[in-house]
């Protein structure tokens, strides 16, 4: 992104004009649908480094006193304590109606593409810059919803967001596929190494 013009250096055909600076809160609404307590909730968590939202599988059941909140497929989530470690994700369909505490808030999206948002906030020039500004020099960096929603974001039209999000998702799928192939080849090589030498 060229800072002065707010236009990216590379664009898809048919899209022109400057991107607009807005606040994240212009596009997200906090969701607080009460769920179960810690003992009964089907839990999910947000992985670090933009790896998404996954089922929480730890043995600890949680406290009867801890309130959980229902999360819906397509919502955006982040980890308050792990903001500076890019704990961001979109709730997948497979985890619809799973729950988290308020330490991992969820938001409904309006006129912003989830894949576009996810890819933007996982860039270091977003989460480090705004995460550090938000909390100064405190050791425990907890980014509250109000602070997050007030952060600026530069966005194109919704149509361009969708195009960018779909393109980046396709690249992620290719990376995953090739990573699996690489792991398989490593395993094949290891098997040969074990059997080809005395």
Residue map of PLM features:
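Feature detects amphipathic, helix-rich regulatory segments
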Residues: 1-198
């Amino acid at each position: 992104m060229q800072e002065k013009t707010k236009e990216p250096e590379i664009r898809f055909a048919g899209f022109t004009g400057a991107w607009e600076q807005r606040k994240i809160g212009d596009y997200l609404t906090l969701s607080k649908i009460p769920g179960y307590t810690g003992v009964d909730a089907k839990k999910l968590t947000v992985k670090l480094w933009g790896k998404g939202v996954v089922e929480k599988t730890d043995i600890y059941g949680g406290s009867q006193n801890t309130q959980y909140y229902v999360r819906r497929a397509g919502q955006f989530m982040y980890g308050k304590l792990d903001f500076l470690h890019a704990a961001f994700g979109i709730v997948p369909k497979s985890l619809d109606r799973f729950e988290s505490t308020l330490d991992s808030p969820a938001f409904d999206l309006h006129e912003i593409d989830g894949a576009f948002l996810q890819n933007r906030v996982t860039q270091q020039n977003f989460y480090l810059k705004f995460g550090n500004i938000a909390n100064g020099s405190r050791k425990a960096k907890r980014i509250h919803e109000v602070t997050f929603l007030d952060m600026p974001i530069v966005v194109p039209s919704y149509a361009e967001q969708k195009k960018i999000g779909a393109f980046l998702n396709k690249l992620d799928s290719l990376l995953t596929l090739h990573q699996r192939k690489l792991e398989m080849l490593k395993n094949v090589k290891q098997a040969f190494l074990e059997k080809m030498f005395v």
